[in-house]
């Protein structure tokens, strides 16, 4: 059972996660930058920790600083919210390595889905229906035209990289 969640986000996103946690009886930990020191999510959380300057790269994207807060606060799970670290497979892997539950997809899933061609290949292998399209990267206009003719009326767009 998760007892304490660090929400690695701010504003309305953090507040929404906190509301759900409180409904479930889970303690919440907020992180904040210089810009958010007086924000509602900081005041609403059970615990709040300063993580750096206003620039996201120096605060909300600072994986080591957030890990430090997770470990020192006794957090057993992290909710990344939306944006920031929510799609960062390296951060999800860092959480796994430190035995902290990452509330979201696994690092491997994020890594796979970050590459459209690998993701589509995995979906096809698992018999998941996909939209019609190329089987891989389209190298030239002739190949694009051939694929477009095969797709027919379902064609939305094919982009040929130079």
PLM features: residue spans?
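N-terminal beta-alpha lobe that positions the nucleotide/phosphoryl donor
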Residues: 1-148, 152-153
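Gly/Ser/Thr-rich active-site cleft segment
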Residues: 150, 154-162
């Amino acid at each position: 059972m998760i007892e304490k969640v660090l929400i690695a986000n701010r504003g309305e996103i953090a507040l929404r996660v906190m509301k759900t946690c409180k409904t479930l009886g889970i303690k919440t930990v907020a992180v904040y930058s210089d810009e958010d020191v007086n924000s509602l999510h900081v005041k609403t959380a059970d615990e709040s920790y300063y993580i750096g300057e206003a620039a996201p790269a120096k605060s909300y994207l600072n994986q080591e600083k957030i890990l430090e807060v997770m470990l020192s606060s006794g957090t057993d799970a992290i909710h990344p919210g939306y944006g920031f670290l929510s799609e960062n497979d390296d951060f999800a892997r860092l959480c796994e390595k430190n035995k902290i539950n990452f509330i979201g997809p696994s690092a491997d899933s994020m890594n796979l889905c970050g590459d459209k061609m690998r993701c589509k290949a995995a979906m096809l292998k698992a018999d998941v229906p996909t939209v019609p399209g190329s089987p891989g990267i389209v190298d030239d206009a002739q190949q694009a035209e051939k694929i477009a003719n095969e797709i027919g009326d379902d064609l939305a767009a094919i982009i040929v990289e130079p």
